[in-house]
């Protein structure tokens, strides 16, 4: 199998690149930083043991610390789910990712969450309640409260 670049995110300053790389069965997120005119060697953001498989569609908030991405894995509700991780400035690594739960995740594929803190708008890309091969982009106003996946009873 041939490895490919699946999706990528470049911050507004053009000096932080986060991308999904892998093959048709698995992918992981990597990051590289631009120093002067050169990019650093890509480094994986998470260990394989952190329960995230087929990571894709990264989005780094303007704070440069909060990362949202879609992934499948043992902590998924179904299909792709949105996960969040924050960057530890002291250690220079991302914390273990967490499934952000309802209402952003569902049993369908939830691909991308992007939030504009300045204009207080968010976008969710999902295929829930869509015909095969189609997605819907929901626009929403972010709030401070959310239900965590681990706090949700889906039975």
In which residue ranges do the predicted regions lie?
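Short, conserved micro-motifs composed of acidic
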Residues: 1-155
């Amino acid at each position: 199998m041939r490895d490919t670049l699946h999706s990528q995110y470049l911050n507004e300053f053009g000096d932080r690149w986060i991308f999904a790389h892998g093959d048709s069965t698995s992918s992981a997120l990597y990051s590289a930083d631009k120093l002067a005119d050169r990019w650093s060697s890509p480094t994986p953001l998470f260990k394989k043991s952190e329960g995230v498989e087929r990571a894709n569609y990264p989005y780094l908030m303007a704070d440069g610390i909060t990362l949202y991405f879609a992934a499948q894995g043992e902590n998924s509700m179904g299909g792709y789910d949105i996960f969040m991780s924050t960057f530890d400035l002291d250690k220079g690594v991302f914390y273990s990712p967490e499934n952000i739960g309802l209402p952003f995740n569902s049993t369908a594929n939830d691909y991308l969450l992007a939030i504009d803190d300045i204009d207080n708008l968010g976008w969710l890309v999902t295929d829930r309640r869509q015909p095969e091969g189609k997605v819907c982009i929901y626009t929403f106003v972010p709030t401070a409260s959310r239900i965590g996946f681990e706090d949700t009873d889906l039975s």
